[in-house]
Amino acid sequence: MSQPDPVTPVTPVTQDVPEVSGRPVTVSVLGSCITRDNFNSRFNPDYKRWYRVGPTTNQSSMIALMSPPVDEPWEPVQEMKPYGLWNVRSDLSREILTLLPEEQPDVVVLDFFGDAHFGVVRLPDGRFVTDNRWRIHKTDLYERILAMPGTEQLSWEQDADGYFGLWVEAMDRFAAYVADQLPDTQVVVHWGFNADEVVPSGESTPRRMPSRRRRAARKRNAFWRRLNEHASSAYGWESIDLSREYYVTLDDHPWGPMEVHYTLDYYPRFLAELDRVVLTRSAPEEVRVLARELHEAAAEYTRDTARWRIAAHEHQRALAVERERPTWKRVLRPRGPGAAPVPPAPPAATATLLEALRGAVDDDAFARLSRLATTAEEHVRWLRETPPTLSAD
């Protein structure tokens, strides 16, 4: 076996990042549970060693967030828990835009669940609210808004290009707000997506969701990816994209099965990627290059294994179909799928990259950066060991 090319060692450095100064990095989340759950001890037990959660929003549309506040009085017309009441108040008041400059968080992580899943309601005066069927629909304000002449419900399902245009205008305003009010804050785009398979309770084999739900998830993913791509490319922000690594949902998720409640190996994987972004922000170029190459090797390994899993399961299904044909047909007109796909090998460069990093950063930073490789390997193990996906029936 050929040896990987040597990586030139770099001089050890002291990382000029907040956690070395003795305090955790403050992270604010403008998004949903797909991001917020990464800062929950159920999913990442040790996250508080390195991160502190600052002001957040939940499930707000960026279009609504960047329009003027809606300060009309309101009351719930259905039972709502305190968190749901806060959710409505936060969305209507845009309080996050006041809280962030006061906090000056080190990092803001964005995800666009609110726009991908809900859309907005445009009031006659041009203000917007998030059309959240789980929250504001339970208030008398929502009933009053819908009764106003000139009110419009807008979603990408109705007009993808029109909605995208409104969203880009809002994002441009948000980017200007960050530059003016949060000049030292690092913005990270978390690429959310919808899973379309679910692992039933007590089982290990994923099942496809019903076809209608799968089609809806795929359409939503296409628009969500459009949002992610724009936010990642237009404003010079960092991004974390695990959407091509093949994650499913599960009945035994702490919050129950849903397209955005991923298998539990997702959350350590996300945190490893965030560690890379945070730890290398002010690092020497050599360290940034090593961490980026380790990240790329881990991502390629998981994506290649995800593709292999799909191909291997298709191969097994093709073999099963061939075995059902009469023997004489198989002999005279074989239609076998050929050789089975071979799973990808672990990246040869990983060990060399880790060795170079060990000599370039302190022990804590090395332990965290090395999780780029270990969390990828954990997910690869799941991809290899999990039985083939079954149909929804």
For every predicted segment, state its role.
Residues 5, 12-107:
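Basic, amphipathic N-terminal segments that precede the first structured/catalytic domain
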Residues 74-153:
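A basic- and aromatic-enriched beta-loop-alpha substructure that forms the phosphate/nucleotide-
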Residues 83, 136-172, 207-218, 258:
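Surface-exposed cleft-lining segments at the edges of enzyme active sites
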Residues 254-293:
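Histidine-centered active-site loop/cap adjacent to the catalytic His
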Residues 280-393:
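Boundary detector for helix-to-coil junctions that initiate low-complexity/charged tails
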